[in-house]
A protein has these predicted regions:
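C-terminal outer-membrane/trafficking sorting elements
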Residues: 357-368, 372-451
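Repeated scaffold domains used in trafficking and secretory/extracellular systems
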Residues: 36-40, 78-83, 127-133, 173-179, ...
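Blade-level signature of beta-propeller repeat domains, shared across WD40, Kelch, NHL, RCC1
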Residues: 324-349
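Beta-strand-rich domains and repeat architectures in extracellular enzymes and scaffolds
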Residues: 31-46, 51
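Sec-dependent N-terminal signal peptides
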Residues: 3-12
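Short glycine/acidic-enriched loop and turn motifs that connect beta-strands
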Residues: 96-100, 147-150, 192-197, 243-248, ...
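Asp-box/BNR beta-propeller loop motif
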Residues: 17-30, 56-72, 103-121, 154-167, ...
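Entry beta-strands of beta-propeller and related beta-repeat scaffolds
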Residues: 47-51, 88-92, 139-143, 184-188, ...
């Protein structure tokens, strides 16, 4: 009998509500038993998404996962990550590009055709593989890899047409996932050593698009590395920690931040023996609110876990096998990839969103100072947890900079615009607009920049 004790756990399994929310999609591709799982998927909205597989396939759905079509099958690739910058332009990353150097794939037509990114468009060393992608807006996307080294960070500011690559192996052993709030601020996770026996959990933070990185967390234990990131709000985020089987530590942890990634603290979720049978070795982590989330594993058919209190306690969820990625489209809909694809629908929240829309669910205050130079504060208020997108628009309707794109909790918030565009370049004096969009409504304010 497996000797597993979840820390601070109440042994009441939440089958009721959770089983109604998560469902396995019957027509989704199933990973072969020898490959165990699909590593990533990405949805632009509630119906349109892409799934990548370890055998080099990219699948597309336009009906919320009811049906799937194969868009690409490249047997030379091990597809590890995928992201879309807009409805047409997407990027997929290959984990094992050692010999063919086919590390990046791109599409300009929503996946009708995919092509290998020409290495001549990559400035710097060509990465050997990628594990994570983070798309910020229609022009900006970041990537990193690999989980077993060497460690590379890549970025594009022109929709994937050209790339910059940075070899970070002198200071980092492995890079696995990353998350950017905007074109400047982001975090990246992995391990201190490319050899798992010597690796410690690592979190890096940047405020200048990855020109430089600050180490904000290093784990105390060896045989651990960061795996996946989830930010349900601007300030609250979570990181799963994968633990190597047979490691000495008998307690497994995850990380949490409450200040937007500047500092992190670990929380235990499981006590176990040191045998492989009893290791959870978490991979996927995904929170739809600051307190409600899930965590997955691929070791020995471990169950997906669920928390309702921000990770203080965990129970077995009623879905998922080998879950590696969990993504949420809005506050009532999400998808997860593992042995197959799973879909989350909170019908209560969806019905409220559809039938009880109130005109005053959000407010966007005038920025201050206004006019401004060089930066300005833009306050806004949410009356409930919402998916929030905040963009700076010029007078021609073009998006200059994206300041927020994700779930945020109810209450008062603010963002800061530094008078720069998505590439970090200073914009000229003139009239600009701040547009706040949620699932229910949008508000726009005029902003004056004076140089």
């Amino acid at each position: 009998m497996r000797n597993i004790f979840f820390s601070i756990i109440i042994f009441t399994v939440c089958w009721g509500q959770d089983s109604n929310n998560w469902q396995e999609l019957p027509n989704a591709p199933i990973a072969p038993s020898e490959l165990k799982k699909h590593d990533d998927l990405f949805f632009r909205n509630d119906t349109t998404g892409w799934l990548i597989t370890r055998s080099g396939q990219i699948f597309h759905t336009s009906d919320g996962g009811s049906s799937w079509i194969e868009q690409l099958h490249d047997t030379t690739a091990y597809m590890r990550c995928v992201g879309f910058m807009d409805d047409l332009h997407g990027i997929a990353g290959n984990l094992l590009a050692d010999s063919l150097r086919n590390v990046l794939y791109k599409t300009h037509n929503a996946g009708l055709t995919w092509e290998v990114v020409d290495t001549s468009t990559i400035t710097g060393e060509i990465p050997y593989g990628l594990c994570g992608l983070s798309a910020v807006d229609s022009l900006t996307i970041f990537g990193c890899g690999r989980h077993h080294g060497p460690a590379y960070f890549v970025r594009s500011f022109d929709g994937g047409e050209s790339w910059e690559s940075f070899n970070m192996s002198d200071s980092v052993g492995a890079l696995i996932d990353l998350y950017f709030w905007d074109q400047n601020r982001g975090i990246m996770i992995g391990g201190t050593d490319e050899h798992s026996d010597d690796s410690h959990m690592l979190v890096l933070f940047t405020e200048n698009s990855g020109d430089s990185w600050e180490t904000v967390y290093v784990g105390e234990r060896a045989m651990e590395w960061g795996w996946k990131i989830s930010f349900p709000s601007e300030s609250i985020g979570y990181i799963s920690i994968q633990k190597k089987p047979y490691s000495d530590a008998t307690t497994e942890y995850f990380l949490k931040t409450t200040d937007g990634g500047l500092t992190w603290f670990e929380l235990p979720f499981m006590f176990a023996d040191t045998s492989e049978e009893d290791v959870y070795s978490s991979q996927a982590i995904g929170f739809i609110t600051p307190t409600r989330g899930w965590m997955g594993s691929y070791i020995n058919d471990r169950p997906t876990l669920m928390t309702e209190d921000g990770g203080v306690s965990w129970t077995e969820a009623s879905f998922g096998q080998n879950v590696n990625r969990i993504r949420f489209v809005n506050h009532w809909l999400g998808y997860a990839s593992g042995r197959t694809v799973y879909k989350y629908v909170d019908s209560t929240a969806m019905n409220i969103n559809t039938h009880s829309i109130l005109p005053n669910q959000i407010s966007l205050s005038q920025n201050y100072p206004n006019p401004f130079n060089p930066r300005t504060v833009i306050p806004f208020e949410l009356l409930k947890d919402s998916f929030v997108k905040i963009d700076i628009i010029d007078i021609k309707g073009r998006t200059i900079q994206s300041l927020s794109n994700g779930m945020q909790s109810s209450g008062n918030h603010h963002v800061i615009w530094n008078g720069r565009d998505n590439r970090g370049k200073t914009v000229s004096s003139g009239t600009y607009f701040c547009r706040l969009i949620t699932d229910e409504s949008s508000i726009t304010r005029k902003i004056l920049l004076v140089r």
